[in-house]
A protein has these predicted regions:
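Soluble catalytic regions of large protease machineries
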Residues: 33-37, 43-217
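Ca2+-coordinating acidic residues in Ca2+-binding motifs
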Residues: 8, 208, 221
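C-terminal helical "lid" subdomain and adjoining coupling/linker elements of P-loop NTPases
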Residues: 1-8, 16-33, 131-137
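Generic detector of well-ordered alpha-helical packing
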Residues: 39-40, 225
Length: 225
């Protein structure tokens, strides 16, 4: 071919995000179903919260990064700042996959390992770096060395305060996990519908997801409309 297509460009973006498609990794039917619900859990929780980046694609095609599937969200326009609500929403979205597994299968898997890491990272940063905890206010609890080289971070507080920080991190992640569960419980029929579609087609575009998602969806009671 002489020209790259839009699909080629999208695949290039996905290679950067998640690696190449690993077509020789064949999931069992049960694993494929679990991954379908897991990814749709992320997407639904994201869609049902304010100020969340739009879902562009959901797929259960394994990638060389090790991901068995992923949900792609892309900000509309440039976005340099995140407020407290947006960060809490990100944490809730990270927990959405595990929440879907719990709700549908009554069991949890190892598939949420990266989600757990990211949710914890965001929660800790909110408390130690961004002053988003009322008790600590605008006191820096963490310092970062070689910030522009992806440097290491270290806590700059007493052991007692570090213990309290750990408690605050756990509390924050738990709260957002419960929020994710509530969103999925309120929209369980859509969860089933979209997960079934993903299971059958392996990939859903953002347009397809939004077309289905906003048909008779139940909005959270605290959502601003």
């Amino acid at each position: 071919r002489k020209f790259a297509t839009q699909a080629d460009l999208m695949e290039s973006v996905e290679v950067v995000i998640a690696g190449y498609q690993k077509k020789n990794r064949i999931l069992s039917d049960k694993e494929k179903l679990i991954v379908s619900y897991h990814e749709v859990g992320h997407a639904l929780v994201a869609a049902m919260q304010t100020n969340s980046a739009p879902v562009q694609k959901i797929t259960i095609i394994p990638r060389t990064s090790g991901a068995l599937g992923y949900t792609m969200q892309v900000e509309e326009g440039e976005h340099f700042l995140m407020n407290k609500t947006e960060m809490e929403n990100k944490i809730a979205t990270f927990t959405g996959g595990r929440a879907a597994e719990e709700l549908i299968f009554g069991e949890i898997t190892t598939g949420a390992s990266n989600d757990i890491e990211q949710a914890t990272k965001f929660a800790r940063a909110m408390i130690t770096r961004y002053g988003m905890n009322e008790e600590f206010d605008m006191v820096a609890m963490e310092s970062v060395s070689n910030q522009y080289l992806g440097g290491d971070s270290s806590l700059t507080c007493s052991m007692e305060t570090q213990t309290l920080i750990d408690q605050k991190v756990v509390q924050l992640v738990k709260e957002q996990h419960q929020k994710a569960k509530k969103i999925l419980e309120d929209n369980v029929m859509k969860l089933h519908e979209i997960a079934k579609f993903l299971y059958e087609h392996e990939t859903i575009t953002g347009e397809e997801f939004m077309a289905v998602s906003y048909t008779h969806l139940t909005l959270p009671t605290n959502r601003e409309v």
